[in-house]
Amino acid sequence: FEKFGLYAGEAFRNQGFAAGAVGGFMETARKVDLAWEPIPIIRGWAGASGPLTDETLAHFVGTITNALKRADQVDALYLDLHGAAVAYSHSDCEGHLLQACRDVLGDSIPIVLALDHHANLTHAMVEHCDALVAHRTQPHNPWETGQLAATLLFNILLGKLTPTIAWKKIPLITHQEQFLTSPAGPMREWFELAREIESLTGVASASTFPMQPWIDVPEGGWAVAVVTNNDMALAEKHANRLAQFAWDQRDRFLLQESIPPADAIRRALESDNGLVILSDTGDSVFGGAPGDSTILLKEMIRQKVQQPVLLTMVDPEVVQQAIVAGIGSTIQVELGGKQSGSYSTPVRLMVQVSAIGGGEIQAACIGRDTFSAGRAVVLTLGSIQIVVSETYGVGGNHPATYDHFGIDPSNAKMIVLKTASNFQYYADWTSQIIRVDTQGATMSDISGFNWQQLP
């Protein structure tokens, strides 16, 4: 959290009030004709990874509940949460936090949630909040989510909304390949149905939750939630509509379009013009993978790729080795594959150290203005340029990763992105997107995981 952005109190006000769902919330809230004052408590952001330690979870819960206890007056609580956090001792971190907040505030103080649409909605989360709203699109648009959350919260305070929530779990999880709402497809249709429902009289919000598929928890699964103005029958009716649509379209949601690495590289090489995006689906850093898979790099070497290629790799050991050697040096490295378990292994290469940099990189990405790559270097292997960093940052999924080193992404033939859905930052140059069926912690073949708790 400290690496990606952890701010408390006034530091949160100064650093976190202008971005993401909190920024959208504040923009709308400032326009409300009501005297009020925000009490910033804490903002913690971290990329997807393994479970939270119990100490980390206790820190956040304690910080928030202690702030609520110290406050002279609390009229409402706004929480901007992802919704799929897991700790070693808690399979539902958000539900645990909400219950703790409710224990402090009592039942009369409204709690409103802004959630990522990849949240795992649970009984505890719904029971201990008054209203909720999820992201409206994929790629994410957290600003709009925060705006609607503010509308819900202040309508409650002004007596314009008596929130009533109906929600449904759907016995379904799918891979990530059909998660986008930007092209035509089942996810777009599902989200558009929610917007249609949301436009109806008496409906305050309608949210769809295609849960991120890499958490093995007892209440796991897709969900929907509808908030109405004191009309449970209306909420139930439309929650059922949304749930039934997802279930009826499950075969379309399960359609897998990714192809084997060898075929993907060949198809990219056969492309006549423009940039080809290779989506490394098994090593998606936004889904919790380590960002150090060597599968596609090895295949490029095997096929003797001569066209310009850009990719990223997380490997602190190689970063240190390259920095010690210095710019212009040629070094032998054992690159990548150190955190991928059995999915990927290091590759031995002779490379040139072309640049050294890193640190905080400016990029408006996934609700943030900057990201940290730690120390980073550029290694050159023939026509392939590899940005190797200590942390994954955004995994090369934003051009700023390359701009930082003076590399123009538009000149590349292929760029490997460590995501299965966040391609939008390269849209101006992209001629083709190829999803690659790579093995890894976020691979599309979710049937290959050892599920133990999922219902």
Role assignments for model-derived ranges:
Residues F1-A67, G221, A225, M232, ...:
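N-terminal glycine-rich anion-binding loop in soluble enzyme alpha/beta folds
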Residues F4-G5, L52-V61, K69-T162, D280-L297, ...:
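Active-site histidine-anchored catalytic micro-motif
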Residues K31-W36, P40, N66-D75, I265-V276:
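Glycine-rich phosphate/diphosphate-binding loops that line cofactor/substrate pockets in enzymes
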Residues W36-I39, D75-L77, I109-L113, D130-V133, ...:
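Structural motif
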Residues G50-T53, S89-S91, T122-E127, E144-T145, ...:
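Short acidic, glycine/serine/threonine-rich loops at helix termini
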Residues A150, N155-R195:
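Conserved anion/nucleotide-ligand pocket segment
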Residues Q178-G382, V387-T391:
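Hard-cation-handling environments
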Residues W247-R250, E360-P455:
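Extended hydrophobic packing segments that form well-structured cores
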